[in-house]
């Protein structure tokens, strides 16, 4: 972890040096110190409200570190997506602290913070351009070889190779000619080429058939390797291999543990599991 004294820095920036992410801490004498970015994320008694009269999150505490997969489950409106929005600093919290590698995220430039976070959404954002260009959007200076390698790791290379012009096939608009699964594979490849230390997977496999989900899940597994990963999903297969599962209800974490521990408790998670995860 970065020494706690770093929180007093007025400016903390993330940068990439020779393929490694690092924090750059400026000092009063004009020098800087580089500290490798790890991806430790801590929520410390966090409260949050979109409006003053309605609190959304209550006393949220959690810790996630590289190599860990932390999943959030619960009914719609429980606060799952709100937590990931706070990691991105789309909103500032009302009380408590969020730390990233020991640094209060309020001390980190928003652009730098978000550059170190990869996101895979259910509604994949593709644009008019080639497949290569869409994947490269995750890292604009990526070489063709890096893009292709990312697609291979994401399990997208096979379907891309079957397209009329492969990686040079042009997608129109939102790439409606591709299946939902193919669109998600491109989104995974884009996140893979970005090679960020923290990954957020939001509803990433909830609208595809079971067969396609297996292909996407394989790409997801490669993407999550060695990273700090936060997952929000509808399907139990997406979360049951998580290191920690946070069961949320009305903005609170009411249960936490791994799949086996929560099943043994026979609480809310057990109800969701036996009910085919319909509420998650």
Can you describe what each PLM-predicted range is?
Residues 4-280:
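ABC-type nucleotide-binding domain
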